[in-house]
Every structure is written in C-alpha cells, then in structure tokens.
C-alpha cells in the first residue's frame, strides 16, 4: 500500500479527546513494545482462555450473559460527546467504560453476540451480550435467536442528524 497518510495525521483527525489520547499513547515512546505484547499474548492469553474454559465447564454453561455496557447509552448530543461518564459514583473515561464488558471475549477469541435488550426510561438503548464457548458460534447464534424471539419488539431509533464534530 502506497498511502501517504501517516498514523500521526490520522490521530490528529480524531475528534474525541479520550480516543485521540488512547491512540497517541499506543504510538508513543511509552507504548508497549512488540516483545512486551508478544510476551503478554504468549503467557497471559492462554491462562485467561483456560480460566474461561474452566468457568464454562465447572458451571455447565452454554453462555455467559452480561450487559453490553456497564451503564446505559447516553444521548449523543453535540454538547456531551467528549465528556466523561459516571460509573459507580466516579468519573470514568467514556471509551473504556463503554468497551470494557465487550473486550474480554474478543481478547481471548470467544464468540460473542450483543443484542438490543430494551430501552431506559429516557428511551436510550441497553444491550445484552452473550459470550459462548470457543468454537461454539452456532450454539451462540441459536441462543441469541431464542432471546430475540422472547424480547418485545423495540421501536426504531430516532436519527439525530446533527453533526458530531465541530471543526
């Protein structure tokens, strides 16, 4: 690929300060080195995979069920896009808060399925995530389909056509 765009130029265009900082840190001098990353993958990932395998077997589970996010969605009004969120009474990084529940399964290679579960009193969506055993994708899809057949229909989202970025 002969792209003339640099990683620094891409990072400069990220509008959310928290996400911009996260990407900048990944490419800074303090970033995890390839050797450190490889060591973590080789040493720690198999341990985490085994912990998940044990949890499924010891508890005779077909799936682990968690909220997709630890807090409900928030309004994407332009005025609050870059603010932090409150989690357990404390200010927390928006991106990390909203991705923390869904990261674990993907990091260990487990199939996961996030499905809209309902709406808050304010009409904002909440989701539920089903995490399956390794190589049990079809079983997980069946579980998701069964859940969807029991869940009441949800209204279509209202689309906010306001720009999310201010230049």
Regions from the PLM with identified roles:
Residues 36-38, 85-88, 129:
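A short, structure-level motif marking secondary-structure boundaries and short turns
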Residues 41-42, 90-91, 133:
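A generic secondary-structure micro-motif detector
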Residues 62:
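Conserved acidic residues
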Residues 50-55, 100-102:
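Generic recognition of flexible, low-complexity loop/linker segments
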Residues 74-99:
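Short, surface-exposed loop/helix-turn segments at secondary-structure junctions
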Residues 59:
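Active-site charged/polar residues at nucleotide-handling catalytic sites that mediate phosphoryl
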Residues 1-53, 67-71, 76, 116-117, ...:
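Short helix-loop capping/hinge segments that flank enzyme active sites or metal/cofactor-binding pockets
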Residues 94, 101, 106-167:
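Structural helix-boundary/capping segments
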